[in-house]
Structure formats: structure tokens, C-alpha cells
UniProtKB/Swiss-Prot annotation:
Cellular component terms (Gene Ontology): cytoskeleton; cytosol; methylosome; nucleus; pICln-Sm protein complex; plasma membrane; spliceosomal complex
Family statement drawn from the similarity comment of this UniProt entry: Belongs to the pICln (TC 1.A.47) family.
Summary of subunit composition and partner proteins: Component of the methylosome, a 20S complex containing at least PRMT5/SKB1, WDR77/MEP50 and CLNS1A/pICln. May mediate SNRPD1 and SNRPD3 methylation. Forms a 6S pICln-Sm complex composed of CLNS1A/pICln, SNRPD1, SNRPD2, SNRPE, SNRPF and SNRPG; ring-like structure where CLNS1A/pICln mimics additional Sm proteins and which is unable to assemble into the core snRNP. Interacts with LSM10 and LSM11.
Major localisation: cytoplasm
Organism listed in the record: Pongo abelii (Sumatran orangutan)
Stated name of the protein: Methylosome subunit pICln
Disulfide bridge map: none
GO BP: cell volume homeostasis; chloride transport; mRNA cis splicing, via spliceosome; spliceosomal snRNP assembly
Length: 237
């Protein structure tokens, strides 16, 4: 395939953790041949015997896992899903943000499978992948976890220093939502109203019917028991 190119394999300077020879590479079900898989901290690379191969950047890798399905014709292998599209006519993988002419919003996905001849090496390959992937966290996940607002210094405010942070009321907050956020808000409100009006069943009988029958047809004597009321009852000794 034309996207295969010649490049030097990653070495110790790039944090090479695992070098697995005799590994078959499969792209979207199409075999690329047998070569060497290089799992480095900087990138994931595969090169065949002629020196042609490809590299995957960790930020584009959305999933990696071990496939233990022996019924698969490939057998046990390392599975890697990439958020990029590899095309025969292109020299480089086309990332999602570069597909401006796409007619839909479907994110491109490419599946790689690496099948080593030595199946006992799969665990070490997977562990090396986990370690390298952890060095390249998703920026979107980091942004969602971090609070990007200004810190509110209570002590400074009490001394008349610093600005009061801006808060939105519920209505004002809705006006700042994006179209997607507003759609999500409406969907959540619909789910909430549906759950409130939902009638729960108990042994096939609606609980509200039980409560109504209980209130209409059953009287409960709330008169407190007087001490000594049953003192004249027979008691077996």
C-alpha cells in the first residue's frame, strides 16, 4: 500500500520499550506482511523486511486491547483502533480535523491488528502499550477534568480586594449553552419528567391503587393500648 514508507525504526532515544519481530500487521482485514513491531514512548511503529512501514501517534490511538478469540482466523493478537483514515493514495494518515470535505460527521476509524508468531509475548506487548499510552493523555479529557475558571480568594474579597466571580442563574446558564448543550438539556428534562410520572408496580398492582384502597377501605385503630387492659386474661404457666 502506498502509505507505507521507509524510515529509521525508533531507538533507545525515543524510549523504545518493546521490539517484537515476526509480527504480522493487518489493516482493516488486509494483511500487510510480516515485520517488526516497535513500541516506543514516542510512537508505535511497524516495519517489514524491506524497511517499509508506518508509525502511529499515540494521541490518535483511541483503543488498544488483547484479542483472545481463538476462533478468529488471526488467532490471539494485539488490537489497535486509530482515529485516522489510511488511504492507498495518501502518503500519511488523514486525521479527522483534515477531512474538511467530508459530507458527514462520522469520525474516521482504522483498525490495526498485530499478530506475533510468539503468542507468549502478547502480555508484554500490551503492557508496553499501556505504559506508552499513559504518557500521551487525551487533551480533551484533561480539559474536562480541570477547572479553567479563576480562583476565588475569599480572604481577599473580605478585605475588599479581588473580583467577585461571575455566576449564572438557571435561565442565564441556558442562554450560554451551545446548540448541542441545549439539546442535551431538553433530553434530560424529558427523561426527568417521564421518570416522575412513571407509576411503579408492586406484585403486578400499582402502588397508587394500593394507597387509595388503603385510605378508602381500611381503618387503623390508633388508640394506644392501656396498661393492664389484658391483665384478666388467662395465662398459661
Amino acid at each position: 500500500m502506498s502509505f507505507l514508507k521507509s524510515f529509521p525504526p525508533p531507538g533507545p532515544a525515543e524510549g523504545l520499550l518493546r521490539q517484537q519481530p515476526d509480527t504480522e500487521a493487518v489493516l482493516n482485514g488486509k494483511g500487510l506482511g510480516t515485520g517488526t513491531l516497535y513500541i516506543a514512548e514516542s510512537r508505535l511503529s511497524w516495519l517489514d523486511g524491506s524497511g517499509l512501514g508506518f508509525s502511529l501517534e499515540y494521541p490518535t490511538i483511541s483503543l488498544h486491547a488483547l484479542s483472545r478469540d481463538r476462533s478468529d482466523c488471526l488467532g490471539e493478537h494485539l488490537y489497535v483502533m486509530v482515529n485516522a483514515k489510511f488511504e492507498e493514495e495518501s502518503k500519511e494518515p488523514v486525521a479527522d480535523e483534515e477531512e474538511e470535505d467530508s459530507d458527514d460527521d462520522v469520525e474516521p476509524i482504522t483498525e490495526f491488528r498485530f499478530v506475533p508468531s510468539d503468542k507468549s509475548a502478547l502480555e508484554a506487548m500490551f503492557t508496553a502499550m499501556c505504559e506508552c499510552q499513559a504518557l500521551h493523555p487525551d487533551p480533551e479529557d484533561e480539559d474536562s477534568d480541570d477547572y479553567d475558571g479563576e480562583e476565588y480568594d475569599v480572604e481577599a474579597h473580605e478585605q475588599g480586594q479581588g473580583d467577585i466571580p461571575t455566576f449564572y442563574t438557571y435561565e442565564e446558564g441556558l442562554s450560554h449553552l451551545t446548540a448541542e448543550g441545549q439539546a442535551t438539556q431538553e433530553r434530560l428534562e424529558g427523561m426527568l419528567s417521564q421518570s416522575v410520572s412513571c407509576q411503579y408496580n408492586m406484585a403486578g398492582v400499582r402502588t397508587e391503587d394500593l394507597i387509595r384502597d388503603y385510605e378508602d377501605g381500611m381503618e387503623v385503630d390508633t388508640t394506644p393500648t392501656v396498661a393492664g387492659q389484658f391483665e384478666d386474661a388467662d395465662v398459661d404457666h
